[in-house]
Every structure is written in structure tokens, then in C-alpha cells.
């Protein structure tokens, strides 16, 4: 088989787009904690000295959004005015309305039965919050069943944050990006060919020091040694300088890192972002559910790779279509896998929210370093508790 290269990138929590994502999800979490049935669609823009939060929020609780914005920025690490963006001094503007009544018509019905178990009729009565198509994916090339390029890129971005906050590399600042190229043969990862790390830093630190520290404490701390060889190329701050960064260097906007958030381009994406959206928005909840489904299919050994697409209509509970692609790696047919999905997974929006327990303040931590492939108990869509059942029903 011919060998191929595939590349994915990730960014740190201090990247301007990720600052915006985290603010949006911090607002969502604050509302979910006080009002689990609140409706939230919070969009954030950040730029030099300014944060603007806009969108639609319907809730019976009060959230101090400016205070929440500042505490989120402080947690990320923008705490000095000379960074061009500072938790204490930045301006915070808000422009928020209630959710459109026309949209609510398709979602609200039967939410008066929100306490206790909903019967099948009530589950059918709660429709999707919008039309659209969503994808889920899993691959057996890593232990967490994620594509290797995005998994390693996300882990390196997370490691950049760790070495900064723990003082291991004390001169780093919050912004940063990572990129990993993996060589494949017959869809099996062979080696890492190239690693790129760009890390914001104090102006008086030499390029040689930065390169040495990043290779030692970030790249080699994350990339498995067996995936690196004498021909692997490391690029550390290839422009030679990365002092101006974060919202001072570029404006940031919620929802602009959807490939970083998911599978690094290895799987398709329906186009809908996640952050700032409550779980009635199927852009988010259905994507989480499809990751859960795909991961269980791969964990069960039904396929080595699996991509699933579903589509919804606003106000309609059941998906309009389900498509499965195992890329020729399936142990049973894709049609048979679709039958197993319909038998074992309820893809109606209210059932997704129920089965993944999505009405909780769990979203801020998803907003940096990827929504998938994370080993955290609160990421319920990463469970593989259906794998044994799927394997048995498939006759494997």
C-alpha cells in the first residue's frame, strides 16, 4: 500500500477563538447550574481590550455575565495589561435577547413533563432545535479511539498550558498552536513526520532556549518515543518570535475552531459549532451522541473506523436519515450496523439529553483541548458501555 501523510492542528486555551469559546461555555455552565432547562445560545467576540457577548438566553435565573467573563479570562492567564488583554481592565459588553418564540415552538412541547421519566410520546413531542446534519467518528488507531494527529496535537496544546501554569517553562504566555503530521500505511499510523509548535513568550527569551524547552518538555513529553525517529522534523516558533498574541494579536470568535474541537479533519463536519449552546441544540448534543455511537461500534470490534451522519428537521424528534461508513473495515455490513444503531441508541433530542445526562454544568472544560477523546467521567459520550451488547448482537 502507498504511504500517505495526514496533518491536524490544535490550539491552547489562550488562543483568541478558544478564549471566546470558553467564555460562551462558562456562561452556559453558570445557567445550567441554576436552571438546567434554560435555553442558551451565547456568542462571544474578543479583541484588544474588549469582550462582546451576544445571543439569545431564556432562563429564570440571574447570572453576572461581566464577572463571569473576567473570571474566565483570569483562569486562562490573561492577567497583565501589557498582554494587550487583561481580565481586570478589559471592557465587557453584552447584547442578549430571549430565544425566538418561533424556534421554541418546535422544542418546548412536553417540557412541562421535565420532572420524572418521559414516556415515548413525550420524547417524540420534543423536536430538534434546528435542522442540519451532524457527524460522529471513531478509529482504533489510539487507545481513546481518536485519530492520532488530532489526539497528539490536542495533547501538546494542553501540555503547553500545563508547563506555563506549573512554572516548568515560566516565560510562556497563554496563546499557542500545535500541529502534527502522521505517516500512514493502509490507514495504520507508522510515524510522526513533522511537529509544529508556536508558543507565545516573553520578549527577552532567546529562540534557542524556547526551542530546547519546548522539544524537551512539550513535544517529547507527549509524542510516544516509538513514533519519533531520526527523520522527524520539529519546528518551534518558526517565525522566530511570538510575543504579541491572544486577542491583542487576532480577534477571537466563538465557533471558529470546529475542526480542532472534533476530529482534526479526519472525519467530516456538519458545520455547526458547539460552544455556548445548550443541549437542545442538536449541533452539539447530536454530535456528542454520534461520537458515543461510533466509539462503541469501534470498541465492539464491528469496524476499525466508523463515521456516522444523521440529519434533523426543526421541530421533528426522529432523525431524517442515518448514514454509516466504515471505510471497508467493517466486520459486518454498514446496513447491519445501522440496524444495530436503531435498536440500541435513541437519537431523539430529548433521549440524547437524558441518556448522556447533558443538563449539567460540564461544558467549560470541553471548550479547550477537544470535545472528544478525553478521559474524564463527565464526558459521558466517551463511555463504551454498549460495546459488549453490540458485539453480541452482531454475532462476533
Curated annotation (Swiss-Prot):
K(+) binds at residue 43. Its cofactor is Mg(2+); K(+). Residues 99-109 are annotated as: Flexible loop. Its EC number is 2.5.1.6. The keyword Nuclease does not apply. It is an enzyme of class 2 (transferase). One of its GO terms (molecular function) is magnesium ion binding. It is found in: Cytoplasm. It holds the Pfam family S-AdoMet_synt_N. Keywords: ATP-binding, Cytoplasm, Magnesium, Metal-binding, Nucleotide-binding, One-carbon metabolism, Potassium, Transferase. Catalyzes the formation of S-adenosylmethionine (AdoMet) from methionine and ATP. The overall synthetic reaction is composed of two sequential steps, AdoMet formation and the subsequent tripolyphosphate hydrolysis which occurs prior to release of AdoMet from the enzyme. Belongs to the AdoMet synthase family. This is S-adenosylmethionine synthase. The gene is metK.
